[in-house]
């Protein structure tokens, strides 16, 4: 749990730096690309697990 807290802290600090330095527009463009890349990876992962017959671990 502490590990996740540190990860989110680092993400928040980076987001704050990007937001307050005026390069938020470029960061938003990159974030959109990364978002869609991870959506594609999620779909691929779900399909692979469905074909293998494994249920997702929660």
UniProtKB/Swiss-Prot annotation:
Principal cellular location given in the protein's record: membrane
TM stretches of this protein: 6-26, 28-48
Keyword Transmembrane helix: yes
InterPro entries registered for this protein in UniProt: DUF1328
A Pfam family this chain is assigned to: DUF1328
Keyword Lipid metabolism: no
GO CC list: plasma membrane
Sorted UniProt keywords: Cell membrane, Membrane, Transmembrane, Transmembrane helix
Membrane topology: Multi-pass membrane protein
Coiled coil region boundaries: none
Subcellular location per the Swiss-Prot or TrEMBL entry: Cell membrane
NCBIfam families membership: PRK13682.1-3, PRK13682.1-4
Protein family membership: Belongs to the UPF0391 family.
Protein name: UPF0391 membrane protein Sbal195_1447
């Amino acid at each position: 749990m502490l590990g996740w807290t540190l990860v989110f802290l680092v993400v928040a600090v980076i987001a704050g730096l990007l937001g307050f330095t005026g390069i938020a527009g470029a960061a938003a463009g990159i974030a959109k690309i990364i978002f869609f890349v991870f959506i594609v990876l999620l779909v691929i992962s779900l399909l692979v697990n469905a074909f293998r017959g494994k249920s997702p671990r929660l």
